[in-house]
């Protein structure tokens, strides 16, 4: 090791050669030796040299330090080599060095170790002249660490490097490798830690063809994580994949992307979670011609499954979706297709729901038993649509069946007992088909089957009185209507085919006569005062009107009223309703308004009677028109009063349809209202009334909106005997597909009230369901609101009440700048007095889905309120309110939706008075929003029932405000509903007042609309003294500087029904007025706009056995651009002797419509409608050749 010592020895050897000279015969050989010894150390060295080689060595030892050094050097023809060793036994140190070289290369190595610290290091180097290899290693036993490194340089220019480090103390190991030549590069890195059970590695490869690949993975056993990423690239394509899993949460996710040389690509994601039982996957594939995407989701926890697919190619775009929910056994699927040029489109929607339900109650204290079972409640519905350049076809249908059984038994210690058994079986089916081309056809089918059986028994030992009743009814109905129309125009024909029946004639400026196919009107009534049966009151009214190619506007109004009265003898009365159809095809800047009103009144006194009356249906169609609007309003009012004997009343509801396809800048508004009132006194009666259904459809429209509103109100009051009341709910559907800058708003409201006094009764009422769908909509919004209110009041006897809830669904897929808002509200109230009662009420469920939405928001609110109060003394007051606020952040072009619901119920009996008041206020604000919407809904329901003493006062109101400023392509929708019911019996008077006010404001909006709807319903039933009922509804809608917009204000429907018997007199008045007709003429900066106002009022009062009744009803409507029709029907009947009265009134406003049409600026064609050919003015008849 001591190079200085070696050099010294070599120098001494050279000097000795010169000093001593050459020995004879051995002149090229030199040998030198040196030795030195003492007690502490010893040294020795030598040098040998001959002609070709030299060798030298040295050795040194120290006994005190316990160390020694050795070195050896050799040089000759084979090369040069050197080795050295050093040892220190005292400190346990060792070191070595070796070196060798020859003509072909060489090698070297060195190392040291320390046994005291257990450390060791080594270095190696080898070369063969072309290739070089080097390595090093280190070891530390104290820290359990080890380190290795290696490098290679090859003759071809390639090289590689690797390193390895490990430490048992930190339980960590790291490895790195790198290799490169002129074509290939590879690198990898690996890191593992045993203490945290974690391992990660990464790699990179580049091949000779230029392709690259890289990846990394991370695994952790402690946190149960595993992540992997892989990417690759070639000269033609790229791709990648990422996987992640967490076994602690039982989660897995996967994403991939691949592209092909032809430019196509596919990508997808997969997610699954076993902990919350969810799975989701999405795939997308695209090439130069088409793109396909699919989305699948499932939740085994919520028992839900959904899938959606979209495909877009050169021919067009198709969309399909499927939903399945196993918890309530519900299925739905939809398909839609739109051609690339927009000429061919179709859509299919199917839904199915099955539910089973049973309930059993038992109480030992009062021996109360009640059980009910509803099984196999199945409903199916479908919707089909098709359109091309020439044809617009639409068909829809629904099918439902229901079986229901209920029974109750009650007894107390005083001997009073009552039992009730009811069985129901329902079946219904409906179908609707619309087809439009050069001709048009519309057909509607419906079938209904209703079977009911009820048995009631009451016994009381205290009064030794017993009463039993049994009733069974079976009802079947089927209806079918079909209409078709075609129009033929001839330029030079001078002969006109004329049918002198009840036909309408149209006159235009080109002196052409077009025939409008119409129906006949038939009415008949018969009454008898003899001791025989009164039957045969059959009233019907049908009218159809069709228009073709109108340039400006058209209006149709039809009204039918039928009355039948039979007195003093048992009788039956049947009356059918009225149907009105209006169709408009290819109208520019036109307006279609269709209004149908039906009023039926039946009064039978002092004997048993049964009555069945059909509802009212209204259709309005519009296709391919620009800048126009379609408004259709249907109203049905049915009233049945039977006194002093058993009677049953069944009345059908009201259905309204509005269709619009391929229109720009327009609006579709349809409103259906149904009101049914049944009053039976002093004997057993049953009342069944159907609900109200409203449909609104819109496809491929820009800048427009679809609004549909359905309202159903049913009231049954029976006194002094057993009665049962069943009422159906309200369903509303709104569909919108591929709409831009549009909105879909649908509102359904159902209110049912049943009041039974002094005997056992049962009430069952269905809920309300609302659906709103929107797919592929941009800058649109979907808003759906369902409200259901059910009230049952039983006094002095046993009763059971069961009411269904409310369900609301809103779906939105692939929407940009859109929003989904769904609101469900359910309120159920049961008040039974003097005896134990049971109340069962369903809740409220709300669903909102949004997928792949940008800058959107989803808001869903559900509210359910149930109250049961049974009292024997004093009074109770209950009041509650609900306020709800919804916020959305980080959304641009979004929406704010807030919903409030308040329900208050008070029931007091036998003493004192009670006062209940409740209100609901809801506010939604949106400022500076683009393509957004503000939707706010308030609902208030108040119910008061007081019996036998004093007076009660109930007042409730609902106020709703919605503001939107500086919104483009937006909409403001606000809806207020107020329902108040008061039932007081046997003493004094009661006063009930309720109102609803709704405000909607919109300023500086383009393609927007303002919609405000108010509905108020008040019902009062008193047996003695006087009762006063007043109801009002006020609605205001404002719009300024709107283009292609529409303002619709509907002062909905106001219904007041009163029934009083046994004494005194009753006076009722109801008035509804709307004054906004001339606003049309005062508007500025409005293009293709429309405002429609419709008021309907129906008032009916029945008084029997004594005194007189007076009824007053007024309706005033002033509206402008198109004909606005108001229909008022008033029927009053009082029977104290053998007398019968029948009244029928039909009013149409012809001349007012004619005047407005004549004075409207820019009118291209004038349309006049006449019932009889002789009503045509002489100069007109002369011009058309009549």
Curated annotation (Swiss-Prot):
<feature type="signal peptide">
    <location>
        <begin position="1"/>
        <end position="21"/>
    </location>
</feature>
<feature type="compositionally biased region" description="Basic and acidic residues">
    <location>
        <begin position="180"/>
        <end position="198"/>
    </location>
</feature>
<feature type="region of interest" description="Disordered">
    <location>
        <begin position="518"/>
        <end position="1157"/>
    </location>
</feature>
<feature type="compositionally biased region" description="Low complexity">
    <location>
        <begin position="705"/>
        <end position="1004"/>
    </location>
</feature>
<keyword id="KW-0677">Repeat</keyword>
<feature type="repeat" description="9">
    <location>
        <begin position="897"/>
        <end position="934"/>
    </location>
</feature>
<feature type="compositionally biased region" description="Polar residues">
    <location>
        <begin position="356"/>
        <end position="380"/>
    </location>
</feature>
<feature type="compositionally biased region" description="Basic and acidic residues">
    <location>
        <begin position="286"/>
        <end position="299"/>
    </location>
</feature>
<feature type="compositionally biased region" description="Polar residues">
    <location>
        <begin position="393"/>
        <end position="409"/>
    </location>
</feature>
<comment type="function">
    <text>Provides the silk fibroin thread with a sticky coating. Acts as a cement by sticking silk threads together.</text>
</comment>
<feature type="region of interest" description="Disordered">
    <location>
        <begin position="39"/>
        <end position="119"/>
    </location>
</feature>
<feature type="compositionally biased region" description="Low complexity">
    <location>
        <begin position="553"/>
        <end position="698"/>
    </location>
</feature>
<feature type="compositionally biased region" description="Polar residues">
    <location>
        <begin position="416"/>
        <end position="445"/>
    </location>
</feature>
<feature type="region of interest" description="Disordered">
    <location>
        <begin position="131"/>
        <end position="494"/>
    </location>
</feature>
<feature type="compositionally biased region" description="Low complexity">
    <location>
        <begin position="211"/>
        <end position="224"/>
    </location>
</feature>
<protein>
    <recommendedName>
        <fullName>Sericin 1</fullName>
    </recommendedName>
</protein>
<feature type="repeat" description="11">
    <location>
        <begin position="973"/>
        <end position="1010"/>
    </location>
</feature>
<feature type="compositionally biased region" description="Low complexity">
    <location>
        <begin position="465"/>
        <end position="491"/>
    </location>
</feature>
<feature type="repeat" description="5">
    <location>
        <begin position="745"/>
        <end position="782"/>
    </location>
</feature>
<feature type="repeat" description="2">
    <location>
        <begin position="631"/>
        <end position="668"/>
    </location>
</feature>
<feature type="repeat" description="4">
    <location>
        <begin position="707"/>
        <end position="744"/>
    </location>
</feature>
<feature type="compositionally biased region" description="Low complexity">
    <location>
        <begin position="1097"/>
        <end position="1145"/>
    </location>
</feature>
<feature type="repeat" description="8">
    <location>
        <begin position="859"/>
        <end position="896"/>
    </location>
</feature>
<feature type="compositionally biased region" description="Low complexity">
    <location>
        <begin position="300"/>
        <end position="312"/>
    </location>
</feature>
<keyword id="KW-0737">Silk protein</keyword>
<feature type="compositionally biased region" description="Low complexity">
    <location>
        <begin position="518"/>
        <end position="537"/>
    </location>
</feature>
<feature type="repeat" description="6">
    <location>
        <begin position="783"/>
        <end position="820"/>
    </location>
</feature>
<feature type="compositionally biased region" description="Basic residues">
    <location>
        <begin position="1148"/>
        <end position="1157"/>
    </location>
</feature>
<feature type="compositionally biased region" description="Polar residues">
    <location>
        <begin position="39"/>
        <end position="48"/>
    </location>
</feature>
<dbReference type="GO" id="GO:0005576">
    <property type="term" value="C:extracellular region"/>
</dbReference>
<feature type="compositionally biased region" description="Basic and acidic residues">
    <location>
        <begin position="321"/>
        <end position="334"/>
    </location>
</feature>
<feature type="repeat" description="3">
    <location>
        <begin position="669"/>
        <end position="706"/>
    </location>
</feature>
<keyword id="KW-0732">Signal</keyword>
<feature type="compositionally biased region" description="Low complexity">
    <location>
        <begin position="1015"/>
        <end position="1075"/>
    </location>
</feature>
<feature type="compositionally biased region" description="Polar residues">
    <location>
        <begin position="104"/>
        <end position="115"/>
    </location>
</feature>
<feature type="repeat" description="1">
    <location>
        <begin position="593"/>
        <end position="630"/>
    </location>
</feature>
<feature type="compositionally biased region" description="Polar residues">
    <location>
        <begin position="256"/>
        <end position="275"/>
    </location>
</feature>
<feature type="repeat" description="7">
    <location>
        <begin position="821"/>
        <end position="858"/>
    </location>
</feature>
<feature type="compositionally biased region" description="Low complexity">
    <location>
        <begin position="145"/>
        <end position="155"/>
    </location>
</feature>
<feature type="repeat" description="10">
    <location>
        <begin position="935"/>
        <end position="972"/>
    </location>
</feature>
<keyword id="KW-0964">Secreted</keyword>
